[in-house]
Amino acid sequence: MVRGWEPPPGLDCAISEGHKSEGTMPPNKEASGLSSSPAGLICLPPISEELQLVWTQAAQTSELDSNEHLLKTFSYFPYPSLADIALLCLRYGLQMEKVKTWFMAQRLRCGISWSSEEIEETRARVVYRRDQLHFKSLLSFTHHAGRPPEEVPPPPVPAPEQVGIGIGPPTLSKPTQTKGLKVEPEEPSQMPPLPQSHQKLKESLMTPGSGAFPYQSDFWQHLQSSGLSKEQAGRGPNQSHGIGTASWNHSTTVPQPQARDKPPPIALIASSCKEESASSVTPSSSSTSSSFQVLANGATAASKPLQPLGCVPQSVSPSEQALPPHLEPAWPQGLRHNSVPGRVGPTEYLSPDMQRQRKTKRKTKEQLAILKSFFLQCQWARREDYQKLEQITGLPRPEIIQWFGDTRYALKHGQLKWFRDNAVPGAPSFQDPAIPTPPPSTRSLNERAETPPLPIPPPPPDIQPLERYWAAHQQLRETDIPQLSQASRLSTQQVLDWFDSRLPQPAEVVVCLDEEEEEEEEELPEDDEEEEEEEEEDDDDDDDDVIIQD
């Protein structure tokens, strides 16, 4: 367990995690009283550029190590959201700041350092499998810290490039043998001894099949059934070495004893990846040393999102296979599609329902003809009809039910031209499901099951019976309408329309409503003429009078 590290005097603490370096970062308020003795402090990296470095006491980062709820949450996803952290604190009575600090310390121990884009993309990948723990093997690193100090001497502190903290490593007194991962100060007297109960709890967590983590017992049973050795399980598929691995290998080149009787600290293996892992791993001196190298690659192997059990490993592109071990890219393997186009397609993250919809094949002409022929007779199929249609067409029942629903919707809104052209005479345009009409589907479906599935179109209407009736009677009687409709294969309304078209056109009669006004207008000119004649006669009389006076 990383208890803390002692920064050399005179050096400025800086962060080199892909963010901007900060110069001379003072400790926070909690650490202000311990500035004279910085051995018990630990520097936690920020998550974004806006956050400052977090200095906290190393003892606070290990208070919650025995909380199974936090361990399970970290095993599911090492970057929980604020909502998840708040829910944990509310449900189990924890303090928000301590929980956030604990998660940052766990990520630092496991060497997980992702950018914000990688966090969001990886969260989107694992959101479809909420019932599985995708990172259940990461915390097995920290469980080695519960062993007594005499079993695990302090290994060398990594260089600044590996941990991401820009502080030079302290000088090493002598190379030591490493059985597990434990980073301690050089003087054991500075650190208080762990309680015995805490050590026993740690040891019980590390034993395979212990009751604290039941999912690990299933994992070891799967290892025994698959036939892989624990050493092969400790190195996982496509184990890669990061940029700063050379310094780790240089400091841990002392021969180490075989530790096959102990479980490996990390198990990066999936059930369907055993052939690839057996052929792609590189031989190592022991399972502990190989897992120690995996932890040394802080941003490579430990930061990879573990593939869930049952997954299929992606094939490595030739450009990545050609890279030497110390130049392999240091980002999670599942997120390399940004640099390798076409590596990870969007179809890998689709839900099973969406993938099933994409695999739906188009219906053939024969299948559509069978469905349309049945729909012309009955728009609401029964369970037996669906079974028959499923046998005849070969289509799955959900597709048949969906086709009937879509076709009924289109018919209700007047969008089915083929239904209007081929509708059965006398049948309603849209059948109400509440009206129980005996569908003629049982007999026809039984016949189609024995004969070829090609339907027979209905015969065209025949007008000759109507013409013979018109030539004989020249008039339509109401009692003869059903017989004529059956003989001509026309509906009752169509028969009536045909006879109406045969009737002679009635004579046009023009009715003028203004006749009285026209008569009055004709009388008025006659009166005017009579008045003019009377005036002329009066004028003649006046002339005669004048002549008489002369």
From Swiss-Prot:
<dbReference type="GO" id="GO:0005730">
    <property type="term" value="C:nucleolus"/>
</dbReference>
<dbReference type="GO" id="GO:0000785">
    <property type="term" value="C:chromatin"/>
</dbReference>
<keyword id="KW-0804">Transcription</keyword>
<feature type="compositionally biased region" description="Acidic residues">
    <location>
        <begin position="513"/>
        <end position="550"/>
    </location>
</feature>
<keyword id="KW-0677">Repeat</keyword>
<keyword id="KW-0597">Phosphoprotein</keyword>
<dbReference type="InterPro" id="IPR001356">
    <property type="entry name" value="HD"/>
</dbReference>
<feature type="compositionally biased region" description="Polar residues">
    <location>
        <begin position="237"/>
        <end position="256"/>
    </location>
</feature>
<dbReference type="InterPro" id="IPR024578">
    <property type="entry name" value="Homez_homeobox_dom"/>
</dbReference>
<feature type="modified residue" description="Phosphothreonine">
    <location>
        <position position="451"/>
    </location>
</feature>
<protein>
    <recommendedName>
        <fullName>Homeobox and leucine zipper protein Homez</fullName>
    </recommendedName>
</protein>
<dbReference type="GO" id="GO:0005829">
    <property type="term" value="C:cytosol"/>
</dbReference>
<feature type="cross-link" description="Glycyl lysine isopeptide (Lys-Gly) (interchain with G-Cter in SUMO2)">
    <location>
        <position position="202"/>
    </location>
</feature>
<dbReference type="GO" id="GO:0000981">
    <property type="term" value="F:DNA-binding transcription factor activity, RNA polymerase II-specific"/>
</dbReference>
<feature type="compositionally biased region" description="Pro residues">
    <location>
        <begin position="1"/>
        <end position="10"/>
    </location>
</feature>
<dbReference type="InterPro" id="IPR009057">
    <property type="entry name" value="Homeodomain-like_sf"/>
</dbReference>
<feature type="modified residue" description="Phosphoserine">
    <location>
        <position position="351"/>
    </location>
</feature>
<feature type="region of interest" description="Disordered">
    <location>
        <begin position="512"/>
        <end position="550"/>
    </location>
</feature>
<dbReference type="GO" id="GO:0005634">
    <property type="term" value="C:nucleus"/>
</dbReference>
<feature type="region of interest" description="Disordered">
    <location>
        <begin position="168"/>
        <end position="199"/>
    </location>
</feature>
<feature type="DNA-binding region" description="Homeobox 1">
    <location>
        <begin position="55"/>
        <end position="114"/>
    </location>
</feature>
<dbReference type="GO" id="GO:0005654">
    <property type="term" value="C:nucleoplasm"/>
</dbReference>
<feature type="region of interest" description="Disordered">
    <location>
        <begin position="1"/>
        <end position="36"/>
    </location>
</feature>
<feature type="region of interest" description="Disordered">
    <location>
        <begin position="424"/>
        <end position="465"/>
    </location>
</feature>
<feature type="DNA-binding region" description="Homeobox 3">
    <location>
        <begin position="451"/>
        <end position="510"/>
    </location>
</feature>
<dbReference type="GO" id="GO:0006357">
    <property type="term" value="P:regulation of transcription by RNA polymerase II"/>
</dbReference>
<feature type="cross-link" description="Glycyl lysine isopeptide (Lys-Gly) (interchain with G-Cter in SUMO2)">
    <location>
        <position position="182"/>
    </location>
</feature>
<dbReference type="GO" id="GO:0003677">
    <property type="term" value="F:DNA binding"/>
</dbReference>
<keyword id="KW-0371">Homeobox</keyword>
<keyword id="KW-0238">DNA-binding</keyword>
<comment type="function">
    <text>May function as a transcriptional regulator.</text>
</comment>
<feature type="cross-link" description="Glycyl lysine isopeptide (Lys-Gly) (interchain with G-Cter in SUMO2)">
    <location>
        <position position="200"/>
    </location>
</feature>
<dbReference type="Pfam" id="PF11569">
    <property type="entry name" value="Homez"/>
</dbReference>
<keyword id="KW-0832">Ubl conjugation</keyword>
<feature type="DNA-binding region" description="Homeobox 2">
    <location>
        <begin position="355"/>
        <end position="415"/>
    </location>
</feature>
<comment type="subunit">
    <text>Homodimer or heterodimer (Potential). Interacts with HOXC8.</text>
</comment>
<keyword id="KW-1017">Isopeptide bond</keyword>
<feature type="short sequence motif" description="Nuclear localization signal">
    <location>
        <begin position="358"/>
        <end position="363"/>
    </location>
</feature>
<keyword id="KW-0539">Nucleus</keyword>
<keyword id="KW-0805">Transcription regulation</keyword>
<feature type="compositionally biased region" description="Pro residues">
    <location>
        <begin position="452"/>
        <end position="463"/>
    </location>
</feature>
<feature type="region of interest" description="Disordered">
    <location>
        <begin position="223"/>
        <end position="265"/>
    </location>
</feature>
